[in-house]
Amino acid sequence: MKYQFSIIVDPATYDNEGLSNGIDLRKNNFTHLEDRGAIRAQQDWATHIAPIKQFKGTLGHDYSFMTVCVPECIPIRLEIISYANEFAFMYDDDTELDTENNTSAENDKLMGTFLAGTQGWSPPQDQSSSGKTRILKQLFSEMMEIDKECAIATMKAWAEFLRVGSSRQHGTVFTRLKDYLPYRIKDVGEMFWFGVVTFGMALHIPDHEMDACHKLMEPAWIAVGLANDVFSWPKERDASQRLGRTHVVNAVWVVMQEHGFSQEQARQYCRELAAQFVAQYLDNIRNIKNEESISPDLRTYVEAMQYSISGNVIWSKFCPRYNPEKRFNQTQLDWMQNGLPSTVELDGASNTSSSFLSTSTHGSPASGSQTTIESKDGWTADSSGIVSLLLNCSLPPLSHKVISAPLTYVDSLPSKGTRDMFLDALNHWLHVDEQRASQVKMAIRMLHNASLMLDDVQDGSRLRRSKPSAHRVFGVAQTTNSAAFLVNESIKLIRELAGDQGVAAVLEKLTSLFVGQAQDLHSSRNLSPPSLTEYIQTIDQKTSALFELASRLMCLCSTATVVPNSSLSRFCILLGRFFQIRDDYQNLTSPEYTKQKGFCDDLDSGTYTLPLVYAISQQSENFLLQNLLSTRLAEGTLDDDQKRLALDQMQLVKTNEFLRKILDSLYDELRAELQCISSSFASENPQMELMLMMLKL
């Protein structure tokens, strides 16, 4: 991991009380940007929600929260994540003295505001919630302007935090630490902080690595939660007393009940336990430092999070929030009392300086790493060794390293994660246990990756998610063989997961996939455009089929008492159609798609997408367009000038406008179908709402 924006603080200047041994304290060089973001959030809260009384948030005289907890935050992003974090602290204080039911209702309302705000509509809410809506819209707008992809991932993480954490169980009386700690990981803000750090450092953690991320980070979050409980104990104890509660949702209180300790004994016990989890976490960092099977961004995230541990400890010791005798520094006081300056420079550089707009802060494996080559036993001058080997019928099977290499490559490429998000949203209704849900995700990902590899070979695609397609790295034969192996492995996994019914489902959908692909290839090879009906049938047998299979497998594993299979099937079919037509449209119009797959990649492959099918149907005697397709078939590709000419011909009949209308209609129908399914389950599904919002153009 590279260190560009922070310095190490002299350890002689602070005492970490044994809570972050082995971890440096680092401090961001642009702390004034945190001051600006936090104070701006306070002012907006006071303007749009309610006056602030005796609030002490994230700022500190020498150590403000974000400055030491995310020391490698890219400066251009520091102000906005500090704004978000200060809002979270104010929201937490605002709900701290409320009942559990009211807090949960407020969380649901805020999640609804979050979803509604990003879609441009506002449900009727009270004055206070409307103010929060306004603040969130401003927050998301600024984040999207900086980095849309990271911002959407962060919103998803924050929505998950509101769903599972954010004081939802503050009415629960925990009396055993082993019951309390899993809750504390969620409530301390694991997913909120994940969103903050990944946005602040421009990190992109693939969805398929989230389980690994949770496991690697678990000891860190326990350590942070315990340390936070040690320092916040007086504040939270007093708040519970004011509310008339007989318990405190804090590890110190839990340890007092479980072991009969005094307050100070319980705090010391928590300190010692936190130190043990810090040691476990540092082991995790060392173990994955050069582990290339883990994405560089996940390795960076895991390494960077150690500074959240040390930063949280030192901030907690010196912040006015937990230490009433501490004061803010003069700049902070001036800005709080007299208002913020109109702009803040990044130490002499404009805050739009390109030097701060980097989108990656990866480290790289140590240059001195070595590769171990296995010796080839048996090859000796003495033939007896060879004969002995030939007569040994118990040799172990070959390693899967070679056959898995193309699969590992494709799986490592950045992904929108739509299918994983779809499965998570389905599980909101279906209640599949975590292990089986993860297996369904794995099986669907395996089939999806296999289809990508085969499609790229058959379509001649040069790029996949902005990287060379697998067959251009490993060759057509190896890629095809690996894809077939992946299909085989997915069937084995599904058999273990869902038995004969699962195997029947996957074989049915594999048949659909192959038949749909055959229709696609036939049309391209023979310059035979499909009818609109044939085009939709092809989508249903390819894109929709995988969504249907995912839904069917989840239903087979579900513990829900009522499952509206026909409605789910219709939703999956419509979702597949929307997803594919959106992809067709984006392939011809989106700069991001050009970066990922090349300029108008579908025209290179000769695929009859909906834009092409529509344009041909509307101008059957457009010989120019027909001859461009013939040239593509003869030469195997079109150059950019030829593609631009084809686009011009399609726009003669306003193809793009037609597609937008189709997509809008499909989107409206998807939302209506979602409401019907939600009614059948008697449960709204914010995650599915969020997924649709993210797909909307």
From Swiss-Prot:
Binding-site list for substrate: 92, 228
Ligand binding (Mg(2+) 3): 455, 459
Catalysed reaction, written as an equation: geranylgeranyl diphosphate = fusicocca-2,10(14)-diene + diphosphate; isopentenyl diphosphate + (2E,6E)-farnesyl diphosphate = (2E,6E,10E)-geranylgeranyl diphosphate + diphosphate
Function: Multifunctional diterpene synthase; part of the gene cluster that mediates the biosynthesis of the diterpene glucoside brassicicene C. In the first step of the brassicicene C biosynthesis, the bifunctional diterpene synthase bsc8 that possesses both prenyl transferase and terpene cyclase activity, converts isopentenyl diphosphate and dimethylallyl diphosphate into geranylgeranyl diphosphate (GGDP) that is further converted into fusicocca-2,10(14)-diene, the first precursor for brassicicene C.
Amino acids binding dimethylallyl diphosphate: 464, 542-543, 580, 587, 597
EC code(s) of this entry: 4.2.3.43, 2.5.1.29
Gene Ontology molecular function: geranylgeranyl diphosphate synthase activity; lyase activity; metal ion binding
Alphabetical UniProt keywords: Isoprene biosynthesis, Lyase, Magnesium, Metal-binding, Multifunctional enzyme, Transferase
Pathway linked to the protein: Mycotoxin biosynthesis
Designated name of the protein: Fusicoccadiene synthase
SUPFAM superfamilies cross-referenced by the UniProt entry: Terpenoid synthases
Similarity comment text for this entry: In the N-terminal section; belongs to the terpene synthase family. In the C-terminal section; belongs to the FPP/GGPP synthase family.
PANTHER family found in the cross-reference section: GERANYLGERANYL PYROPHOSPHATE SYNTHASE (PTHR12001), THIJ_PFPI FAMILY PROTEIN (AFU_ORTHOLOGUE AFUA_3G01210)-RELATED (PTHR12001:SF72)
Residues at which isopentenyl diphosphate binds: 416, 419, 448, 465
Binding of Mg(2+) 1, residues: 92
Superkingdom of the organism of origin: Eukaryota
GO biological process: alcohol biosynthetic process; isoprenoid biosynthetic process; mycotoxin biosynthetic process
Pfam families: polyprenyl_synt, Terpene_syn_C_2
Annotated region described as Substrate, given as residue ranges: 184-187, 232-236, 321-322
Region span, Fusicocca-2,10(14)-diene synthase: 1-330
Residues binding Mg(2+) 4, per UniProt: 455, 459
Segments for region (Disordered): 351-376
Binding site for Mg(2+) 2: 92
Species whose genome carries this gene: Alternaria brassicicola (Dark leaf spot agent)
